[in-house]
Amino acid sequence: MSPLSTSAPGVRQAAFRFRCIACGTLNDSASQDFRCAHCGDLLEITYPRWKEASPDAAKLKSTWRNRRLSSEPIDQSGVWRFRDLLPALESDEQAITLGEGNTPLYELPQCARITGVPRLFAKHQGLNPTGSFKDAGMTVAATFARLAGFRWVACASTGNTSASMAAYAARGGLRSLVLVPDGKISWSKLSQALDYGAVTCQLRTDFDGCLRLLQQLVLRAPVYQLNSINPFRLEGQKTLALELLEQLDWQPPDHIIVPGGNLGNSSAIGKALGEMHGLGLISRLPKLSVIQAEGANALVRTLREAGGKRLISVQAETRATAVRIGNPASWKKAVNVLEATSGACEQVTEIEIAQAKAEIGAEGIGCEPASAVTLAGLKKLLKQGFVKPEESVILVLTGNLLKDPDFTLGFHRGDLFRGTPDESASARLDPWRRPPIVLDATLDAVIRTLEQAEKS
């Protein structure tokens, strides 16, 4: 019996409803744009029967730990392993899974020395099946798309969402439609969507334009939206926090720092923290902070210029393409999370992102540029005194190093910032560059290079 069951055998407490984040209206169903029928705001999934279930936190933890020893596919998923806190399935076989989740928590000794924060860790979501955190949400959302009877799923994307959606659609026997901004996403991400069979449309607009078109499309065609506006996506993504706390033996860190793009991930993690605290799984809430690229800083400006009351959209421009979003859909949810956890929101420059990415790479784990905003942001939060050196800090790395090889090669070759206003400032990055060395194919040439490297 599930630890969230009532006395009746087999009764699951993951029965859910859709709740508007603005007016609080509850509904048993949602329209295809996942907007409140009364006020037009975003929806979230809530579980009203949890309060009457009197959950046993110790049994939940034991159940989740024991499932890791199971050979069942659903238990091998680091998302569905926590299915007691997810929307219920009638049978485990309904889940579309690629074995997502169960990602590592790394110590960062070199970055710890650089920042002066000894207890510094990275939760690396880039080691999911398609190389990003999106897989944790997509396994749930794609599953419910198929259960709802849809043949087609669709998304607007800066790259990671399209790769993930296309993979899970293929796995679940669904067709997928991808809308991406032409020339503004990494080719490695685009190639994933192509290989997984997506119908891929490169639109002459930015991500925000792609998302606007998608929201019109789902109201006119039998297509299921799989962007993070879809609350099923966030239910899957919230398991990152459950898995993280399990890895920490349910002892909350002082800080969790997350990249900020469309803001669904920070919203999902914040939702999970609130639910865990309410269920007695953790004793206190960590501070969750969101870091944005300076050129895609809609949430930063929303908080500073409008007090978090209205969105200040921006024309996004950053080399960290995964967060190149100027009109984030989940901004209200993110504001609520920052308030609930007493978190911070900060922005970092392109140079700061590039340096932080190199520093993470020197740990032997690597990440895509958007993930590196977390380390760059930590440095700023330390200078401001918001983070204390003696506190524990988790950096959420959302994407794999291989997601954006052009950035990495450009950085090490020294031409990433060539011809830009940042070119002169980028000289400070020289100690971190490791350009490829072209040599004659002789032993002496290789030995001389080795000797020179030994001196550096």
Question: Predicted regions span which residues?
Answer:
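PLP-dependent amino-acid enzyme catalytic core
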Residues: 2-456
